[in-house]
């Protein structure tokens, strides 16, 4: 499945009563909430002696993907385009791959 296919399928479950502004707000709030749930799983593993709950973490990553798709939809941009723009930025920042020097003195 491509990112655009995922976005199109995921958006069939979008609340149709929301306008674009509300979709955007819901998307970014959802991203924060789901990222927090993912962090909590890792925190329990690293700091509280729990086994890493890989399946729960994968489910949370799926929720992050849904809210990312929703946020991109609200901005009228495809996930493929979001990711392509990110790769362009990373190539400018780290043209030869990651280096601490480029990280410290990174190009924006």
What is the predicted function of each stretch?
Residues 1-61, 65-108:
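Flexible "arm" and connector segments at domain edges
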